[in-house]
Amino acid sequence: MRSGMNKMTVREIKSTFGRWIAIFAIVALGVGFFSGLRITRPAMVHTTNEYLREHDFYDFRLLSTLGLTEEDAEAFGALDGVKRAVGSVSSDALFSLGGTDSGETAARFLMLMPEMNTPSLTAGRLPQSSDECLLDRKYALPSDIGRKLYIAPDNDADTKDLFAHSEYTVGGLADSPLDLNYERGTTALGSGSVSCFVYIPPEGFEYEVYTEIYVTLDTDAAIYTDAYDAAADAMEPRLSERLTERAALRRDSVLGEAQDA
């Protein structure tokens, strides 16, 4: 009886072989697709984590309306669980690129820091003097290297005073870990959109205080893991408390300087 059933099964398969191959292919495709979906997230998280670690990406960005000082950075860096705290300067400003017909456009100018949020050089070289810069590779072409970038006169006085020079030479092109998306953000300037980022050495800015402090945690935990979330959640209230304390000290300092003037 079983032998006859086996023969019938074999005969059925042979007579409809194409159909069985199609069913097998559909099942194999479904299994492959499901396996791909299951591995996609871990693979993407791993790739992102490795990229951010390679470029020393920050964990917290601290802001204060009165600015932040080097003493503030040291105070945050002294907290247990903090690996590094670095002051930085950034500003949105209108600029024009010499030798092009782009006109004035808005860019986000960033301080080039060797120890945190380091860009990926894609063409040219890093700035070697205070009047050189790195330009967003998604905005410019390699042929733009060597051209002058002019700070537009239409910027307000405070913005223009933030720059040590009125023009900078494009030394290279780069990607930035601060701008992982294609869009570069919004601004109150120009059309309302940031067209690109521009990295300038610290000496290329004229500043008395930092506009932000970047903090990295002393942990090897990968992003999107429970261990990382726990470390970040534990650190956030401590940073917030220290920021409130430092802001009060900064306010008292500014008021004291105003009274002595």
What is each of the regions a protein language model found here?
Residues 2-261:
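Membrane transport/envelope proteins' first extracytoplasmic loop
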